[in-house]
Structures are given as C-alpha cells and as structure tokens.
Amino acid sequence: MANIGKWNAPSATVTVLSTGLNSLANATMSAASSNIANQTNLDIYVDVEVVLASLSPTTGAFVALYILESIDGTNFPAQSDADLRLTTTQLLVAIPVGTTATTAQRVAARNIVIPPGLFQIKLDNQTGVALAASGNTVKFNAYDVNLNG
C-alpha cells in the first residue's frame, strides 16, 4: 500500500558527550559537545541515552539537555549557563533519574525533534550530586520517517 509512513533505519549510534561529564558538579552544565551535523542526513528525530556511572541521586533528580543551534552554520549562541536555563526554547529534553539507589543509571528519551543543521548539546546535571569521575555518556540515535512506505 502506497503512502504509508514507516520509520527509516536509524543512523549509527553516536556518543555526543563523554569525558566532559567526568566529575561534573551538581547544578552545573557541561561544556558544549562537538558539532553535530545534520545538514546532509536531515534526520528529524533522535533517541537519547544518558548513562551515569555509579552515583546516589537525590529525590527528584534529573538531567537536562540543551541544544545550541548554529543558524548561520558557523556561530553558536553564547549564553551563560544561568541564562540558558531560563531559555526554555533551547531545552531539548529533561530526563528524570527515577531512583535514589547507589548504582549506575541508564535513562532515555525517544522521538525528540532535532534541527536540520549544525548544533551542539550541553548536559545540565540536576541529580543532587556530582557525576562519577568516568563512565558517563550521552548517546544519540538519529532517524526519520519514510513517507513513501
């Protein structure tokens, strides 16, 4: 049957943040990721996986991912972290960390819309504790929809 939308196979899983998360203090943002280029693939969606090495998050803990888009293909917004937190239009996703157990945490969010251009990501640690000295990652799996079935 023609004209049925189906998922396309996702792109390769890409680690967008890793060592920049090491020992990241609570209520602190990471440095921006390397540039993530979506000008060619023009993927629409991304699934995000955040792995936090062993920690004891507090009740209500979460991590937030902010997106910095380069509208002109060269320059990125230069907001302070405090201002970025007030700019909800640049909040990509907030992901709850649903346990306070002392263990590694693996949390994910699905079907997040991404821009058709160059962008970077920052992680805001709101877990109530500093992240571990190693083993923390943010990974993306980008994909789109085939509308020709």
Regions found by a protein language model. Give the residues of each.
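Solvent-exposed, flexible loop/coil segments flanking beta-strands in beta-rich domains
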Residues: 1-42, 49
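Internal, hydrophobic beta-strand segments that form the core of beta-sheet-rich folds
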Residues: 42-52, 62-69, 114-138
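Intrinsically disordered, low-complexity boundary segments flanking structured domains
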Residues: 34-36, 78-81, 128
